[in-house]
UniProtKB/Swiss-Prot annotation:
Entries under Gene3D superfamilies matching the protein: 3.30.420.40, Actin, Chain A, domain 4
Protein name: Beta-actin-like protein 2
Posttranslational mods: Oxidation of Met-45 and Met-48 by MICALs (MICAL1, MICAL2 or MICAL3) to form methionine sulfoxide promotes actin filament depolymerization. MICAL1 and MICAL2 produce the (R)-S-oxide form. The (R)-S-oxide form is reverted by MSRB1 and MSRB2, which promote actin repolymerization.
Native species: Homo sapiens
SUPFAM superfamilies (alphabetical): Actin-like ATPase domain
Cellular component GO terms, alphabetical: actin cytoskeleton; actin filament; axon; cytoplasm; extracellular exosome; extracellular space; glutamatergic synapse; membrane
Amino acid sequence: MTDNELSALVVDNGSGMCKAGFGGDDAPRAVFPSMIGRPRHQGVMVGMGQKDCYVGDEAQSKRGVLTLKYPIEHGVVTNWDDMEKIWYHTFYNELRVAPDEHPILLTEAPLNPKINREKMTQIMFEAFNTPAMYVAIQAVLSLYASGRTTGIVMDSGDGVTHIVPIYEGYALPHAILRLDLAGRDLTDYLMKILTERGYNFTTTAEREIVRDVKEKLCYVALDFEQEMVRAAASSSPERSYELPDGQVITIGNERFRCPEAIFQPSFLGIESSGIHETTFNSIMKCDVDIRKDLYANTVLSGGSTMYPGIADRMQKEIITLAPSTMKIKIIAPPERKYSVWIGGSILASLSTFQQMWISKQEYDEAGPPIVHRKCF
């Protein structure tokens, strides 16, 4: 019997990327964009096997003739039919397993609408016939992956940023904070500030190009004002980027102006505090006795924490806010892009976790709301 035969499937459905694989593995087998592409034009060549919709990497590669849609926005599923297609693609094309033979661990952002996880549960049991499933909170899994039981996790992906303090394995729900400001908003902002340079990006396919520019060239400035002055005085921050058609664009202070928006959301016209202040606010909502441990274990996770310079900037900002004697440590593991998935893989393979699964039998007896009773 191979190890994959009975192992759990771990699926981290992000707003931007879907990470999937087997519990117990140290990395996801499949990582692909959580997108559905539909042709914008009429197919004229018969026998080419054109589909009415493409999923993931295939949609990405044919994006020039497709309209791309992401079924998950700000961590909440907005189109369940498309979501089901993504799950189908995950199980049958990427992992090549039968979902009715494996327990399935899914992930979710905290403070999501309750109906979201009920519907997830319903689809898993009714459409995919899974024998058992569980829904875990993303930030909690990141803490598992970092090997800690106490810490505050700042998880920022493509759709949602959330901050979850955990003490000795207990999440502190009153102090969980959520910002609907993440990678996708930064991509849109970069699209906007690139138009100031005379580069026009408008279609859903061009947005993907801008996302690539963002991932390859953006960084977080340690001191934003100083960096702006430096950029105005010299051309050192300038970098060039070759578009798919060979045209070369130049990008300068946009490289750090774009991610600055997660520290200063007012750039996007969003009235909220930046990630540093939100993290501080979350710590201040916790009991005075445990704050010290949270300051010393601030864990970053998610794709939007991959900008060079973000950990140093975070450290600097929190030192400014916190009491002067406090020891502050920002933990930014190199694999933090996948730490939610890795935490899920660890959780699914723990022997003590096996009684936590929601079984098909329990679902049949209680229906979708069972998920609120059994999952944190």
